[in-house]
Amino acid sequence: MADSKNVLTATDGNFEADVLKSPQLAIIDFWAEWCGPCRMLAPTVAEVADEFAGKVKVYKMNVDENPGTPSRFHVRGIPTILFFKNGAAVDQLVGNHPKATLVSTIQKHL
C-alpha cells in the first residue's frame, strides 16, 4: 500500500473512538492485500490524505484482519470508501475511482 504519514490505520478496536467520534470528516478505505483494485487506489488515497491533512482524517482498514466493521456497515465489495461525519456514514464510493471523484466527494461534505 502507498505510504503517507497522513493515512491512519483503523481497526475493529479503534473504529468507534477514532473514526465515529472524529470531530473532522473521516474517510475509511476498506481494502485487502490480495485486492488488485485496492492496490491501484492506494496511491490516490495517500495523495488525498496529504492534500486534506488537518481537514480530513483518512484511514485504511484491512477487511481480512478486521471483519466486524465492514460487516456492520454492509461493505460487500472492496475497495469501498465510506465517508463519516458526526458519527454517521454520509457517502460511499465502491471500486477504484479517480482522484477527482474522491476530492469532489470530500468537498461536498466539508
What are the residue ranges of the model-derived segments?
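Conserved residues in the N-terminal Rossmann fold of short-chain dehydrogenase/reductase
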Residues: K60
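Proteins that catalyze or organize thiol-disulfide redox chemistry
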Residues: M1-I27, A32-K57, E65-T80, K85-L110
